[in-house]
Amino acid sequence: MLNHTRNNIIYAFMWLSLLVCAGCTSVSSTDAPDSTNEPKAGLASEASALPDVIDPDKSVLVTDDSFVCLSSMRPVRGFFVGNLLGNLEETVAAANQPAGAPYPPGSIVQLVPAEAMVKHQKGWNAKTNDWEFFELDVKEEGAKIKVRGSTQVVNKFGGNCFECHQKAKPQWDLICEEGHGCDPLPIPDFLIRWTQGNDPRCD
């Protein structure tokens, strides 16, 4: 019991440190600056001209129970994917497409336990490529959705998720990885891996 409590305290402290350092870490793998001289021509310019309008008829159902232990999801290059509509292989195929590809509806992407992004049906929100961002309260008994939405989701430390992810080049569908165009995360890999491996929902 003592060790269990101690582990929970350590987990909470490390997760707090992770978010404070990162500002916004929503579902991005560790990134690094582009080694090429190409401009970061992500979705920022074109997205700014689009209205932030949600079509509820195009929503994928997302509840607290949609978010599970990270080790129950499919690992892809240091982050984790799933699909709430049962199309896991399509999501994995998009994640593994060398030239980039749009993720299918129902896709869920997570880097760390307490933040996620979910892809709704086409037309849900053109500004975010139909992605919705989530901040979660994660405990042993499960996850609770604390904050959710399109462009206005800001975590408790002031990081705007969409503003981070819109810097990804168009072919990457707002997914941040090394070379995708997003700002690098000032977090060592070991800290991200430690946080992933200490998801309190996992046995």
Can you say where each PLM-predicted feature lies in the sequence?
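Bacterial N-terminal signal peptides that target proteins for export
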Residues: L2-M14
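C-terminal motif of bacterial Sec signal peptides marking the signal peptidase cleavage site
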Residues: V20-G23
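Bacterial Sec signal peptide processing site at the extreme N-terminus
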Residues: T25-N37
